[in-house]
């Protein structure tokens, strides 16, 4: 079925408390999507973030980001007083340092009220999520006690989960463990309410999960045997991407690599649990760096660039078969951008999952692949660009004149109209799903870029300051209907 949606991170929503949340503005965005005749709201990973603020480097593959908890909803539930709500702030770029200092103070007050008289809903949540929640809460409590030191810098007995040290920590940090569990209850209560509202208005949530976990995560700490580590939970190899036209030294991500033979020996149980969790909170799940299941780029731990890495064979079809067994064949988007061998293409075809097409890449002379629209298939998802791309207006301003000229010739438009023409090319193409970033619908420039890979500084900070008008919703709805992507009338 042809359909379309909008890419909009939760943190980019407007709102009074320094970052987008799961409150009024998220519900209003659902209303906007419905008015614009969209079917999907695609977001970025929603896990708790740490150093670098990247949603792709989370403390847990299962937990939710406390920054997204809406204080006004907590007040409505009687967990905060009006006097305890922070003063409203003008909408501007996310200041993660300020959030780190200010948010826990408010959340502790709400958690104390809940824990003084735990509700049946809270107790049921803790029981249902015990498979990851207990370890995550203890991990975060120890991390706080260690002054936020990364896992690799923890004392040996805590890092390696020596039983006596673990038991002592559970007793010593019992109150903080309860706090982190309460915060997760707040997050998932609000998340589930938003998802219910979205689904009731015909909007499906497209989630995003990184293929790898963070080196500073409860996942690595809890099950180090599932990763390429030594006996002391130190990484022996790390993840990344080889050098290419976009990054001369490649990309050194630094994530733990999986011990795939161990996963296969366990029938991929951890991955099945992860995907089942994701499909319980999202309607569709995009898996980042899907090609890493066929073969992955391995860099010796301690290297300062990705240039010295090598490709290593992954689980390939065995993983795909396990996912089909657990979930069937639907509900997954495979992020298949970058270097694709025939073996990767064979694996993707066997999965049945749609891959991704990036319209900007079609006209980028640095891109070796062919992303021109005539190459697309129905079983694919097309984007003007993703969170890793500059906005289309930004691309027009920064791409080579030759590339812009080629795009305008191909799309039969002037440079001034390039963004609208590229959006139309996405909506009109054969791909079953088309996703347009919110910033492109607003014709925003490079100031609205979400992330520049392999850089630090101003990533993951963009927030929406432009009003989403009924006029814009009508324009989007008109194009969506024109290209036969509007939901069927009830």
PLM features: residue spans?
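Outer-envelope exported proteins of Gram-negative bacteria
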Residues: 44, 204-206, 210, 284, ...
């Amino acid at each position: 079925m042809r359909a379309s949606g909008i890419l909009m991170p939760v943190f980019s929503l407007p709102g009074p408390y320094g970052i987008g949340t799961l409150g009024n503005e998220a519900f209003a965005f659902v209303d906007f999507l419905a008015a614009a005749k969209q079917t999907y709201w695609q977001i970025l990973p929603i896990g708790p973030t740490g150093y670098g603020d990247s949603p792709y480097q989370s403390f847990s593959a299962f937990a939710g980001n406390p920054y997204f908890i809406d204080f006004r909803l907590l007040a409505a539930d009687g967990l905060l007083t009006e006097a305890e709500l922070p003063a409203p702030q003008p909408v501007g770029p996310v200041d993660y340092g300020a959030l780190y200092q200010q948010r826990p103070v408010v959340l502790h007050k709400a958690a104390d009220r809940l824990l003084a008289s735990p509700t049946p809903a809270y107790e049921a949540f803790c029981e249902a999520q015990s498979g990851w929640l207990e370890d995550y809460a203890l991990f975060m409590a120890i991390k706080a006690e260690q002054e936020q030191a990364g896992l690799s810098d923890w004392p040996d007995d805590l890092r390696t989960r020596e039983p006596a040290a673990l038991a002592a920590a559970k007793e010593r940090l019992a109150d903080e463990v309860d706090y982190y569990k309460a915060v997760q209850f707040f997050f998932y209560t609000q998340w589930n309410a938003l998802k219910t509202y979205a689904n009731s208005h015909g909007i499906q949530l497209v989630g995003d999960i990184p293929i790898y976990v963070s080196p500073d995560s409860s996942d690595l700490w809890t099950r180090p045997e599932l990763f390429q580590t030594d006996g002391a939970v130190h990484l022996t190899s790390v993840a990344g991407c080889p050098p290419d036209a976009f990054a001369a030294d490649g990309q050194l991500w630094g994530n733990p690599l999986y011990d795939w033979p161990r996963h296969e020996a366990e029938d991929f149980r951890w991955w099945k649990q992860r995907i089942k969790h994701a499909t319980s909170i999202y309607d569709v799940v995009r898996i980042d760096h899907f090609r890493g299941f066929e073969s992955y780029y391995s860099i010796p731990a301690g290297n300062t660039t990705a240039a010295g890495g090598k490709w290593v064979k992954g689980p390939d079809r065995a993983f795909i078969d396990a996912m089909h067994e657990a979930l069937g064949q639907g509900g997954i988007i495979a992020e298949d951008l970058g270097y694709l061998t025939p073996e990767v293409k064979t694996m993707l075809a066997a999965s049945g999952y749609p891959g991704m097409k990036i319209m900007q890449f079609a006209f980028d002379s640095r891109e070796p692949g062919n992303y021109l629209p005539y190459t697309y298939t129905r079983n694919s998802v097309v984007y003007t660009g993703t969170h890793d791309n500059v906005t289309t207006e930004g691309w027009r301003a920064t791409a080579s004149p030759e590339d812009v000229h080629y795009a305008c010739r191909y799309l039969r438009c002037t440079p001034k109209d390039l963004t609208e023409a590229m959006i139309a090319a996405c909506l009109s193409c054969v791909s079953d799903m088309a996703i347009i970033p919110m910033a492109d619908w607003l014709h925003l420039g490079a100031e609205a870029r979400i992330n520049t890979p392999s850089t630090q500084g101003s990533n993951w900070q963009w927030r929406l300051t432009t009003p989403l008008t009924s006029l814009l919703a009508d324009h989007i709805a008109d194009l969506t209907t024109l290209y036969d992507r509007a939901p069927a009338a009830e």
